[in-house]
Amino acid sequence: MAISKEDILEAVGSLTVMELNDLVKAFEEKFGVSAAAVAVAGPAGAGAAAAEEQTEFTVMLTGAGDKKVEVIKVVRAATGLGLKEAKDLVDGAPKAVKEGVSKADAEALKAQLEAAGAKVEVK
């Protein structure tokens, strides 16, 4: 019996974040690919209007707040850093958590970090 797409989607949908992370790493190793986002160049010659509109944003952690452990968990999930690296990033605030991300991704990460108690800026 063949596995349908729906069966796969249900199985993936029931995984935890850590299990999904392991699954992505297994795909990367097995197929020799990377899950990193590919930057797509915008149309050339847009002129001054394009110069005014920012397309890449940096999410800056300016403070960990009272719930430092929760902030470290969000940083680890968003960046794929190890525990020590994520803790060092949070302890060394202000620091960039992610650079060169879209506005939607930056706002989503900002919301997650703020929900965990961090102080965040999007530049």
From Swiss-Prot:
Alphabetized Gene3D superfamilies for the sequence: 3.30.1390.10, Single helix bin (1.20.5.710)
The source's domain of life comes to Bacteria
Q: Name one GO biological process term.
A: translation
Presence of keyword Ribosomal protein: yes
Q: Could you tell me which InterPro entries the record lists for this protein?
A: Ribosomal_bL12 (IPR000206), Ribosomal_bL12_C (IPR013823), Ribosomal_bL12_C/ClpS-like (IPR014719), Ribosomal_bL12_oligo (IPR008932), Ribosomal_bL12_oligo_N_sf (IPR036235)
| A single GO cellular-component term on record | cytosolic large ribosomal subunit
UniProt cross-references to SUPFAM superfamilies, sorted A to Z: ClpS-like, Ribosomal protein L7/12, oligomerisation (N-terminal) domain
Q: Which UniProt keywords apply?
A: Ribonucleoprotein, Ribosomal protein
Q: Name one GO molecular function term.
A: mRNA binding
Instruction: Say what the protein does.
Output: Forms part of the ribosomal stalk which helps the ribosome interact with GTP-bound translation factors. Is thus essential for accurate translation.
Q: Which family does it belong to?
A: Belongs to the bacterial ribosomal protein bL12 family.
How does this polypeptide assemble, per the annotation? Homodimer. Part of the ribosomal stalk of the 50S ribosomal subunit. Forms a multimeric L10(L12)X complex, where L10 forms an elongated spine to which 2 to 4 L12 dimers bind in a sequential fashion. Binds GTP-bound translation factors.
Q: What is this protein called?
A: Large ribosomal subunit protein bL12
Q: Which organism is it from?
A: Dechloromonas aromatica (strain RCB)
